Every structure is written in C-alpha cells, then in structure tokens.
Amino acid sequence: MNNKIDNFLKQKKLIKVISGLNNFNTTHVIKIAKAASKTNASFIDIAAAPKLVEKVKKEVPNLPICVSAIKPELFVPCVKAGAELIEIGNFDSLYNQGYKINFSDVLSLVKQTRSLLPDTPLSVTIPYLLPLNLQLELAYRLEDLNVDLIQTEGKINKITSLLDNRNIETILPTLASTYLIANNVTIPVICASGLTISTIELPFKLNASGIGIGNAVSKLNSTEEMINLLNEISTRINYSTVL
C-alpha cells in the first residue's frame, strides 16, 4: 500500500475523491485531481482507462491513483500505466442503467482480479442491495481473500452540493453498513454515498477509516471551489477525530 494512503488509514482520516466510474472526460478528471492534490485528499479514484491514468499521472504526479471497474481485465493496463490501487465497485452510476450485482458476482470478480494482479492493493465495494447480514458475510469472505479495503455504499438521489441540508435518513443504509462491517472485520472501511458537510464526521464515529466523496466535488464549477470544499471536509474530519 502507498505510504501516504497507509498513513491516512492508520490515522482514520482518509479522504478518497471519486471522479466517476464512467467519467472519461480527461479535462474534467484532471481538474478534480489538481484540486485534490492541493488538499489533504488521500487519493483519486478514476475510470479504468490507461490513457486517462497516464494523463492524470503526468499532470498530478504526487497524487496516488485508484481505478474502478467491474471488468478485471481492465485493471492490468491501468496498473502498467501508473495506477497504484484498483477497485471493484463505485456501482452508483451503473445502478441507474439497470446493472445489478450479487454476492457471488463480487466474489467471482475478486478472484478473477487477484489471479491477474495478486499483489496490487485492492478495494471492493459492498453492494447496498444486499441485506446487512449478507453484507457482513461478504466482508468476512473478502477478508479471507486478502482484500485491502472495503467501501460501503447506499442508494442516493442526485445532489448538487455537499452543503445541501439532507436528512440523515438518506445515508442511514451506508452508515449501518459501515458500523456493522468496520466493527467486525480487520479490513479498513471507507464510507461513501450521500455524505454532506453536516454528516461528514459520522462515519468516523462508527469506526470507519475514511470517506469517499464524488458528485459533491465533481459538480463544482471551479478548481478553487473544489479545493475549498475538500479543505472544509478535512478540517471537520480532523476536528472530529481529536474529540
């Protein structure tokens, strides 16, 4: 695991910036990456495209890159291009297209991925569609398969800003998953989907090691706005972890 990422995990202060599984707009992704690199963001998670990895790596060499996909064969050229982590997941954008994934699918994808890249740090998203008991069972199985990170998720509606005052009920599924998994397995857990400024600290109270932020950052117009938002997130996380 990259030393920078490992340190954030140990401190339970990891911030993962997600540009989007289906976002292949190089200019936009680099814009997000540059903003992330000027803050305490731990790494950026981008679409699994080798040329995109190369361009982001060239423009922002100090920011670790993770690539997300649901096709294991896509990971190999991306790692060769400079990606340091790989992730099976960030399914949000796929659910709206009717894509479904079940318990067995995840295990199969992990095994296929590990056969191709046995030593590359691997993160896996636990599908929110699974009942909580199956989510925990899947987490145990992922632990046996030496997965390095687990990400939780929940169903979210379109959001325009991380500053939106959203009711906590909208993120209860991902918080419940985070609490259950983070307190029962040794794999670090990242909580994602629907977090806002008012709820950004909650996952850390539930023993999460980090958070994933996507739409709220990517929908901002300027790099400066992205930097300001990520700095605000970092400040709140630092404050919450010292209390």
Curated annotation (Swiss-Prot):
Record flagged with keyword Plastid: yes
Subcellular location(s) per record: Plastid, Cyanelle
Disulfide bond entries: none
InterPro entries: Uncharacterised_Ycf23
Sorted UniProt keywords: Cyanelle, Plastid
GO cellular component: cyanelle
Membership in a protein family: Belongs to the ycf23 family.
The protein's name in its UniProt record: Uncharacterized protein ycf23
Organism: Cyanophora paradoxa
Gene (UniProt): ycf23
